[in-house]
């Protein structure tokens, strides 16, 4: 395996163990040329899956692209990396074992949305807004309505006239009745 730091062609495996979900082998490698250390993952590929894009173009399925799109949706969210890896591995395994040589990009998007919905609501909304090409605030409102089991999201209740604002600490500030 080529070193990602110096490009050296010979690297040595220092440690090898199965990943937590058992779907991959994690290998720690070191480059004898530059002493750089890096991690690789070895996975079984059941079959070549071809993605049929909306434009009609056919491209090979790219697990790394799937990982990146999920990472973007989960950016700055407190989700355990192992859970993210399980989601990506599960979607990949599902696509490879489906028996279909081609899968639409829409089908992959639906699998990602279903996985993110169970993982993190904010990431689900982020991904859906790009995947479904939201154009208006109403698009978000409709999606948020589905998060609460199809029940519409309640609007904030208007304040009654003459009611004082609630105090955060329970104390009134000086000079107020």
UniProtKB/Swiss-Prot annotation:
**ATP-binding keyword on record:** yes
Q: Which Pfam families match?
A: ATP-cone, Zn_ribbon_NrdR
Show where the ATP-cone domain sits.
Answer: 49-139
Q: Keyword Acetylation on this protein?
A: no
Spans annotated as Disordered: 148-177
Q: Where are the zinc fingers (unnamed)?
A: 3-34
Q: Which UniProt keywords apply?
A: ATP-binding, DNA-binding, Metal-binding, Nucleotide-binding, Repressor, Transcription, Transcription regulation, Zinc, Zinc-finger
Give the co-factor note: Binds 1 zinc ion.
Question: What cofactors does this protein use?
Answer: Zn(2+)
Q: GO biological process: what's one of them?
A: negative regulation of DNA-templated transcription
| Annotated TM spans | none
A molecular-function term among this protein's GO annotations: ATP binding
Please give the PANTHER family that the UniProt record associates with this protein.
TRANSCRIPTIONAL REPRESSOR NRDR
Q: What family classification does the UniProt entry report for this protein?
A: Belongs to the NrdR family.
Q: What does this protein do?
A: Negatively regulates transcription of bacterial ribonucleotide reductase nrd genes and operons by binding to NrdR-boxes.
Protein name per its UniProtKB record: Transcriptional repressor NrdR
Q: Give the organism, scientific name.
A: Methylobacterium radiotolerans (strain ATCC 27329 / DSM 1819 / JCM 2831 / NBRC 15690 / NCIMB 10815 / 0-1)
Gene from which this protein is expressed = nrdR
């Amino acid at each position: 395996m080529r070193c990602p730091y110096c490009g050296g062609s010979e690297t040595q495996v220092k440690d090898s163990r199965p990943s937590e979900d058992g779907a991959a082998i994690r290998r720690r490698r070191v480059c004898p040329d530059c002493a750089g250390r890096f991690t690789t993952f070895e996975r079984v590929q059941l079959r070549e899956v071809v993605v049929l894009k909306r434009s009609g173009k056919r491209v090979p399925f790219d697990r790394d692209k799937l990982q990146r799109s999920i990472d973007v949706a989960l950016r700055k969210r407190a989700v355990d990396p192992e859970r993210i890896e399980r989601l990506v591995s599960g979607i990949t395994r599902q696509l490879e074992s489906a028996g279909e040589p081609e899968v639409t990009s829409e089908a992959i998007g639906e699998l990602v949305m279903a996985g993110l919905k169970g993982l993190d609501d904010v990431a689900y909304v982020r991904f859906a807004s790009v995947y479904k090409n939201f154009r208006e605030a109403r698009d978000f409102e409709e999606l948020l309505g589905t998060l609460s089991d199809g029940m519409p999201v309640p609007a904030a209740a208007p304040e009654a006239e003459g009611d004082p604002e609630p105090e955060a600490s329970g104390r009134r500030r000086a000079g107020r009745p």
